[in-house]
Amino acid sequence: MHAVLKKMKNKLVVSCQALEEEPLHSSFIMGRMALAAKQGGASGIRANSKEDILEIKSTVDLPVIGIVKRHYPGSDVYITATMTEVDELMEANVDMIAMDATKQKRPKQSLAEMVAAIRNQYPSVALMADVSTLEEAIEADRLGFDCISTTLVGYTAYTAGASASDNDFALLKEMVQAVKAPVIAEGKMNTPALAKCALKAGAHSVVVGGAITRPQQITKTFVEALQ
């Protein structure tokens, strides 16, 4: 098991991301958000873009799972979709690279080609497969990813409306049984109770984003509850 994954075993990773259209979009703010997460006990940070990661790395000494979200014409894959994004992340010295490992059409290289290229050029970095189905998890495991995450359950056209926590984390349990790599619970982990249930279901660790780092999303849940 990769050293980064050992540090995250049975612990919380906080996703600190704010896209351009969001109020907290700022590398400085994401660095502060990561510091707050560390002070709260997080064991790692997931972050988007070279700029944000450099700021976070200068602010906290936690392992960083890096992604670059970038859209390409004719493809629904936007999480670290090509080697261009991988190179940017390595310039920020990330500890782990997460990428879309779904069966959706890719903009350039195949997933297998990307994994081979990364292993050749950057052999020390850990790789996380963001998947949406059991089939994708099994394929990612075959390709040699260091860990597999349920990040994209509900976010592909063929899993729309689904969540990793559905049916008492049935999908996550199936993945844990079917693959050798550790499985990370991520996506719509909106409460501490859900996060705890994910670990009980066999998750190696839990990634929580919006429920901690997106104030507009948190506010909306309160507003809707009062209506």
UniProtKB/Swiss-Prot annotation:
Key word Cell inner membrane present: no
Disulfide bonds: none
Known role: Converts N-acetylmannosamine-6-phosphate (ManNAc-6-P) to N-acetylglucosamine-6-phosphate (GlcNAc-6-P).
A molecular-function term among this protein's GO annotations: N-acylglucosamine-6-phosphate 2-epimerase activity
A GO CC term attached to the entry: cytosol
GO biological processes: carbohydrate metabolic process; N-acetylmannosamine catabolic process; N-acetylneuraminate catabolic process
Reaction(s) this enzyme catalyzes, per UniProt: an N-acyl-D-glucosamine 6-phosphate = an N-acyl-D-mannosamine 6-phosphate
Protein name, per record: Putative N-acetylmannosamine-6-phosphate 2-epimerase
Endpoints of the signal sequence: none
